[in-house]
């Protein structure tokens, strides 16, 4: 019987891989990318939104997400969009080295190949020359960036006629995962946010930066932090290692009405406390939860270039940015994550196609 079960498991894995290839062929091998502005009254700026989409031949070849540490992913700048109408995934990035939309090109590009349009705003303050701990910790502003991105996509002449506006979901990784939960209806507890960096127990890397930047979370104006950021246009959210989950009002999870898929990277007991989502999965009425045991929180980064770990040490990057589990390469973990995301969004927002 055990041998029979193994055979069935192997056949199922082969069938699933075949299905993913078939789904990809139903999309487009060409992926276009373009920038659009998303005006934000609250931020007082136009958000820079990167959009990946199924494309026809054309455009200029570009590589997005490449850095001294990470490999990039190719796409075609301003290529013509493919015929048809497509579901929309609003993508929220994390902070730090992966604190920009292009850092997630490794997942956005294959999603476009599978027939999704993926739009990701650059959340202000999270990376680059304008990196700011104070702006990064205004977590309650991030869901508004996602809503403004959706508003901009609805008005954009290039995209507006080719999107299925009743088929919109949000995908978030790390801090983007907590953003996805907030746009689904989870509310921040201002006191928990103020207390978040009182110790290093929850997020030593982030909180060290906050303190070194001279930011006192207790002194921040948190009067709007607990507001309702739910956007009812969103049909489904998926959060991968959402962080920080410790700043939410736990009771608000029970009021989330849309389906939610939560994924943690790592084995139970080794998942960062601030990203551990098993308890909130039980609190959300329509949630699923899974783990990828041989991954780590850093598996959400693009594939590391040769020598990246040594460069990180030289640059005094303390996080093990190139460390995954011990049994698989990051590329294999990425393939599994991409397949999980494609399956989830195909089920929840692309079901009519």
Give the positions of each predicted feature:
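Conserved alpha/beta-hydrolase "acid-adjacent" motif
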Residues: 248, 269-276
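Alpha/beta-hydrolase active-site loop
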Residues: 135-161, 165, 194-210, 223
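Short beta-strand immediately N-terminal to the catalytic nucleophile in serine-hydrolase-like folds
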Residues: 170-172
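Catalytic active-site module of serine/aspartate enzymes centered on a nucleophile-bearing elbow/loop
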Residues: 305-353
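Short glycine-enriched nucleophile-adjacent loop
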Residues: 151-154, 177-189
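Short substrate-entry loop that stabilizes the transition state in hydrolases
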Residues: 71-86, 91-131, 269-272
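Domain-level recognition of soluble alpha/beta enzyme cores
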Residues: 25-91, 113
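Short beta-strand/loop motif that positions the catalytic acidic residue
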Residues: 256, 262-264
């Amino acid at each position: 019987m055990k041998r029979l079960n193994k055979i069935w498991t192997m056949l199922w894995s082969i069938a699933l891989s075949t299905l993913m290839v078939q789904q990809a062929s139903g999309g487009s091998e060409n992926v276009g990318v373009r920038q659009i502005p998303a005006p934000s009254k609250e931020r007082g700026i136009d958000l820079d939104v990167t959009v990946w989409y199924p494309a026809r031949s054309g455009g200029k070849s570009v590589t997005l997400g490449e850095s001294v540490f990470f490999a990039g992913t190719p796409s075609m700048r301003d290529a013509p969009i493919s015929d048809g109408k497509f579901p929309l995934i609003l993508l929220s990035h994390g902070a730090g080295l992966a604190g920009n939309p292009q850092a997630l090109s490794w997942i956005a590009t294959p999603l476009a190949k599978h027939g999704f349009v993926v739009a990701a705003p650059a959340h202000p303050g999270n990376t680059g020359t304008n990196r700011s701990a104070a702006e990064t910790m205004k977590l309650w502003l991030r869901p508004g960036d996602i809503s403004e991105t959706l508003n901009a996509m609805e008005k954009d002449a290039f995209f507006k006629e080719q999107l299925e506006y009743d088929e919109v979901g949000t995908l978030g990784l790390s801090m983007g995962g907590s953003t996805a939960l907030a746009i689904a209806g989870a509310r921040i507890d201002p006191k928990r946010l103020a207390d978040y960096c009182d110790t290093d127990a929850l997020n030593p890397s982030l909180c060290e930066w906050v303190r070194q930047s001279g930011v006192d979370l207790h002194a921040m104006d948190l009067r709007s932090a607990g507001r309702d950021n739910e956007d009812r246009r969103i049909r489904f959210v998926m959060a991968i290692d959402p962080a920080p989950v410790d700043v939410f009002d736990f009771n608000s999870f029970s009021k989330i009405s849309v389906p939610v898929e939560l994924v943690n990277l790592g084995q139970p007991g080794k998942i960062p406390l601030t990203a551990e989502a098993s308890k909130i999965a039980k609190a959300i009425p329509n949630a699923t939860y899974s783990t990828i045991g041989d991954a780590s929180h850093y598996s959400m980064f693009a594939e590391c270039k040769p020598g990246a770990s040594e460069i990180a040490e030289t640059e005094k990057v303390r996080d093990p940015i190139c460390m995954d589990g011990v049994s698989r390469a990051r590329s294999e973990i990425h393939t599994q994550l991409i397949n999980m995301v494609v399956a989830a969004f195909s089920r929840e927002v692309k079901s009519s196609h």
